[in-house]
């Protein structure tokens, strides 16, 4: 139902983004040429007919032909998806690996200069727009110091139908700046969340009991407090992974990263309705699957949910 609703709304909105026939033929085309091309593309049918046709094809994994490139939309997305997924996963790993330790430090050293500095920097991280962060990183590392490339994906290796830059040094170099740019907001968010949850957990009675038993601070902090702190972090991180994939558009545009986001921007400029609709449907599907995975993981991590019995149970 969610997918059908997203498909309907996106398909309806995209009817008003522009006329692909004008983009294909130009302003000097005759009315007869416009009518013929509109019929060839199936745009002469009514909206309900076009939508039903789109849904029927989408169920089979086909989204029609790109009006701009004349190729199957499914093939275009299959080419671009690996780049977006690698960028999003890299950004998520950076956000987790850096954000969680910094959040724990900020909680355990609350009031210290280092903690206050981290909170100030994290506030900038959630406030600055992504494109500005990307431009600043390009200015520093690509223009001034010339140590990292500023655009493109670099050299890739084909593993069947999947292309990856993880297996080449050039691919890693090209990945650094866009991945860091995309991770900044998530990193700051995770750090602030971990700090807030850690401070709340440290005030819990079972933490006081653990200290009263004489457990060392390391066991209290990392064996008890951090474990319970990570439960809500898992939920937020899972949901944010979907956001990383969806909102990688800006980062991919700044760095000309050949992913789905850049494909979507190019489709908007050309009023390529099949590509735009397919992109939004795929993003919606990713969100649905991630939400399902997060719910299952949350159930596996939090023992309280496994111990709960249904009402009326014995």
Segments the model singles out, each with a brief description of its role:
Residues 2-52, 145-167:
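Hydrophobic alpha-helical transmembrane segments of membrane transport/permease proteins
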Residues 4, 81-114, 143, 158-314:
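Alpha-helical transmembrane segments of integral membrane proteins
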Residues 9-17, 45, 56, 121-152, ...:
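Membrane-water interface segments at the C-terminal ends of transmembrane alpha-helices
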Residues 23, 46, 76, 115, ...:
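Alpha-helical transmembrane segments and their helix-entry boundary regions
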Residues 27-42, 119-133, 177-183, 219-236:
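Hydrophobic alpha-helical transmembrane segments
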Residues 30-62, 207, 256-267:
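Short hydrophobic, aromatic-rich alpha-helical segments embedded in or entering the lipid bilayer
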Residues 44-100:
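An internal, D/E-rich "acidic patch" concept
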Residues 46, 50, 54, 72, ...:
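Amphipathic alpha-helical recognition patches that constitute DNA-binding helices
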């Amino acid at each position: 139902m969610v997918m059908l609703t997203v498909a309907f709304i996106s398909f309806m909105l995209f009817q008003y983004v522009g006329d692909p026939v004008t983009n294909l033929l130009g302003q000097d085309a005759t009315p007869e040429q416009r009518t013929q091309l509109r019929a060839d593309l199936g745009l002469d049918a009514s909206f309900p007919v076009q939508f039903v046709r789109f849904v029927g094809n989408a169920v089979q994994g086909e989204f029609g032909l790109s009006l701009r490139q004349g190729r199957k939309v499914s093939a275009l997305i299959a080419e671009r998806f690996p780049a977006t997924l690698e960028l999003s996963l890299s950004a998520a790993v950076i956000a987790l690996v850096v954000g969680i330790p910094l959040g724990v430090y900020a909680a355990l050293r609350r009031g210290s200069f280092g903690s206050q500095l981290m909170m100030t920097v994290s506030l900038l991280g959630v406030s600055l727009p992504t494109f500005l962060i990307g431009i600043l990183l390009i200015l520093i590392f690509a223009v001034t110091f010339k140590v990292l490339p500023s655009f493109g994906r670099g050299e890739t290796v084909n593993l069947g139908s999947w292309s990856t830059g993880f297996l080449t040094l050039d691919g890693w170099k090209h990945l650094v700046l866009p991945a860091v740019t995309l991770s900044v907001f998530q990193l700051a968010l995770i750090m602030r969340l971990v700090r807030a949850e850690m401070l709340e957990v440290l005030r819990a009675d079972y933490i006081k009991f653990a200290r009263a038993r004489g457990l060392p601070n390391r066991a209290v902090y990392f064996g008890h407090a951090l474990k319970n702190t990570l439960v809500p972090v898992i939920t937020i991180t899972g949901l944010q992974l979907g956001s990383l994939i969806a909102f990688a558009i800006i980062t991919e545009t700044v760095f000309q990263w050949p992913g789905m986001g850049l494909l979507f921007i190019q489709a908007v400029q050309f009023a390529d309705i099949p590509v735009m609709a397919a992109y939004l449907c795929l993003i919606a599907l990713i969100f649905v699957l991630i939400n399902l995975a997060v719910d299952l993981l949350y159930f596996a991590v939090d023992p309280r949910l496994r111990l709960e019995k249904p009402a009326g149970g014995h």
